[in-house]
Amino acid sequence: MFTGIVRGLGKVVKILKEKKISQWEVETSNELVKNLMLGASISCNGCCLTVRNIFRTIFCVDIVEETLRSTSLNTIIVGQYINLERSIKFGEEVGGHLVSGHIITTGVVSDKKELFSNQELWISLSASFFIKYFFYKGFVCVDGISLTIGSIKNNAFCVFLIPETILRTTIGQKIIGDVVNIEIDFYTQITVDSVERLLKVHPSKFINCIDI
């Protein structure tokens, strides 16, 4: 589990593509790799990946074909920076919201506005089906960053980026057309899906509950 608070950036220094797997080498800070162990989970642009090897400030991860197909990691090239977060430990502060690192869909940056030192970023979902899980002031995780939904229109939503987020993550450098990873709030998904199932199976009982 993660919190959506990016702890540092990593530079992809090597990508080795094989038949059904891609091996990455990511260089980051001493602080971020301190006490990092083999087999540990690490969030790379919001994707939960497993550390396969560590050499000084470089760690290695394997990315399977399904992850490459269903996330924006297939757009990353050598030299590009990604958002990193170590897995949370019990007792630590949860500054964002709980996220699993399991990407539900991707989105495309459809509009970007500079607001003094802030930014307004609009993202269109690649699969409009998932827009039902988006609510005003709800949580969303974009490329591993915990953000608050500012507005929703059709199959798109907007987030407002403060200077700290722009400075410490890659999202401030996004341009129109860039693909980003999206993880919806787990609890919102459970609530929406549960209500939908109840309406489908017992619509009259649900309506009676509302009347009461």
From Swiss-Prot:
Reactions catalysed, as given in the entry = 2 6,7-dimethyl-8-(1-D-ribityl)lumazine + H(+) = 5-amino-6-(D-ribitylamino)uracil + riboflavin
Where on this chain does 2,4-dihydroxypteridine 2 bind? 48-50, 62-67, 101-103, 137
Note whether DNA damage occurs among the keywords: no
Tell me where the Lumazine-binding repeats sit in this chain: 1-97, 98-195
Give one GO biological process term.
riboflavin biosynthetic process
Looking up InterPro entries in the UniProt record yields: ATP_synth_asu-like_sf, Lumazine-bd, Lumazine-bd_dom, Riboflavin_synthase-like_b-brl
Quaternary context: Homotrimer.
A GO CC annotation recorded here is: cytosol
Q: What is this protein called?
A: Riboflavin synthase
What's a Pfam family this protein contains? Answer: Lum_binding
**Reported function:** Catalyzes the dismutation of two molecules of 6,7-dimethyl-8-ribityllumazine, resulting in the formation of riboflavin and 5-amino-6-(D-ribitylamino)uracil.
Q: What pathway or pathways are given for this protein in its record?
A: Cofactor biosynthesis; riboflavin biosynthesis; riboflavin from 2-hydroxy-3-oxobutyl phosphate and 5-amino-6-(D-ribitylamino)uracil: step 2/2
EC primary class: transferase
The family database entries (Gene3D superfamilies) matched by this protein are listed as:
2.40.30.20
State any single GO MF term.
riboflavin synthase activity
